[in-house]
Design a protein with these regions (language model features):
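A conserved mid-protein helix/loop that constitutes part of the nucleotide-sugar donor-binding site
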Residues: 23, 27, 217-240, 250, ...
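Acceptor-binding helix/loop patch of EC 2.4 sugar-transfer enzymes
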Residues: 110-155, 196
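Carbohydrate-associated surface elements
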Residues: 170, 192
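Nucleotide-activated donor-binding/catalytic signature segment of Leloir-type glycosyltransferases, i.e.
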Residues: 263-281
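Short alpha-helical donor nucleotide-sugar binding micro-motif in glycosyltransferases
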Residues: 280-281, 288-293
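Conserved acidic donor-binding segment of nucleotide-sugar-dependent glycosyltransferases
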Residues: 333-334, 338-345, 353-359
Length: 397
């Protein structure tokens, strides 16, 4: 059978960034190399200027900007809208709102090509939830306001797409609720995790020493530093935690518009010595950091699924998260971790409970790895996406 040609659109270059969306693109494409010729069209960020071939996947730069989301996305889509004749494929797939410019140009010219919109977190839902937490910086407030406009674009793209893929039942319901899309167009394909890369490891003293947390218990957060990810809740919880367990280190992986505000606030409340901000890290370092953690905390106030929850559980770590969105689909409450309502004091209480009970941490960690290994596989994700591509083409067997 002839290989299917697929054009994927994503603002961030997946071979240079290690966010959940980017990992999904790479892991899926790697597993479909024999059946799908994937070309990923992505923004010119992090110095990405020339077409690259990595692990059999072609990455093509399209002019954007190094500015933060959503400005980078706007420039990227402007570039794509002018490239309809240049980008040829059997099927097109856009992640989040990274391809609306291309889709709009296709429809305007009445070119009926299969177009799949993959929605990870529903932007209209994200906007609705964004005012539950603080948005203390001008840039964060501006991003929330622009999110409203982007949610309208996402809704329009969802209506015009051939099929919609999303990562959880929760997100599927929100797409119907906010965008009025026919449920029959939606396919749920959950994210996966590479349980060989993310697995329990021992002897991580060197890593802990390297980041300055030797002989301390580690509470780990991984995610973008934006209001939706809820890091201010963890900062407030830390006030209570350090009173009872002063030798606790809070390690933060990721970047975003809240970073400088959070650092300033921690200095103001004399907690800067308890927090370590590492910025973005590569996949190998990320796996090591999961293993350094005693507890993984995910205080997001809106989430489609939460791939970092899967990775933490794959490394046999207990997870703590807010009971919002599709988070409950990514973990087992009271078995692989603990769910609480969005409240900093409740968050502090369950973190303290886990920090003080090693046997509970180990028991939940073991169950977490079994849960993820049994239910979240990139192999399954890739095969289901292949079915979606073929369905969009109309030739599914």
């Amino acid at each position: 059978m002839k290989k299917l040609s697929l054009a994927v659109f994503n603002t961030q270059p997946p071979h240079l960034y290690f966010g959940g969306v980017e990992r999904r693109i790479v892991e899926t494409a790697k597993r479909l190399l024999s059946k799908v010729d994937t070309r990923v069209y992505c923004g010119t960020k992090a110095g990405f200027k020339k077409t690259a071939l990595v692990n059999g996947i072609t990455f093509v730069p399209c002019f954007s900007t190094d500015a933060l989301f959503p400005l980078d996305n706007w420039f990227f889509n402007k570039t794509l809208s002018r490239a309809v004749d240049a980008i040829k494929a059997d099927v097109y797939e856009a992640h989040t709102v990274s391809g609306y410019g291309f889709l709009k140009a296709l429809r305007k010219r009445k070119i009926l090509k299969p177009f799949i919109q993959t929605i990870h977190g529903v932007l209209a839902d994200e906007y609705a939830q964004s005012f539950r937490g603080d948005s203390p910086t001008f840039r964060a407030k501006l991003a929330n306001l622009i999110m409203w406009q982007l949610s309208r674009i996402e809704g329009e793209s969802a209506k015009n797409a051939t099929l919609i893929v999303t990562v959880s039942k929760y997100s599927s319901e929100k797409i119907v609720q906010f965008y009025g899309v026919d449920k029959a167009k939606i396919r749920i394909v959950t994210n996966g995790v590479d349980t060989q890369k993310f697995r329990p490891a021992q002897d991580l003293g060197e890593i802990k020493h390297q980041i300055g947390i030797s002989n301390k218990q580690c509470v780990l957060f991984v995610g973008r530093l934006i209001p939706r990810k809820g890091l201010p809740f963890l900062v407030e919880a830390a006030k209570h935690i350090v009173k009872e367990r002063s030798e606790t280190a809070f390690v933060v992986v990721g970047n975003g518009p809240l970073k400088n505000h959070l650092i300033s606030y921690l200095e103001k409340i004399n907690l800067s010595g308890s927090f370590v901000f590492l910025g973005d890290v590569n996949e190998g370092m990320l796996a090591a950091l999961y293993n350094c953690a005693d507890v993984f905390v995910f205080p997001s106030i809106q989430e489609g699924l939460g791939i970092v929850l899967l990775e933490a559980q794959a490394t046999a770590k207990p997870v703590v998260a807010f009971d919002v969105g599709g988070v409950h689909e990514a973990m087992l409450d009271k078995e692989t971790g603990l769910l609480v309502k969005p409240d900093s004091r409740e968050l502090a209480d369950v973190i303290l409970r886990l920090l003080s009970d090693r046997s509970l941490r180990e028991r939940m960690g073991r169950k977490g790895r079994v849960f993820v290994s049994s239910n979240f596989s990139w192999d399954v994700c890739a095969q289901r996406m292949l079915q979606v591509y073929r369905e969009a083409l109309g030739d599914i067997a």
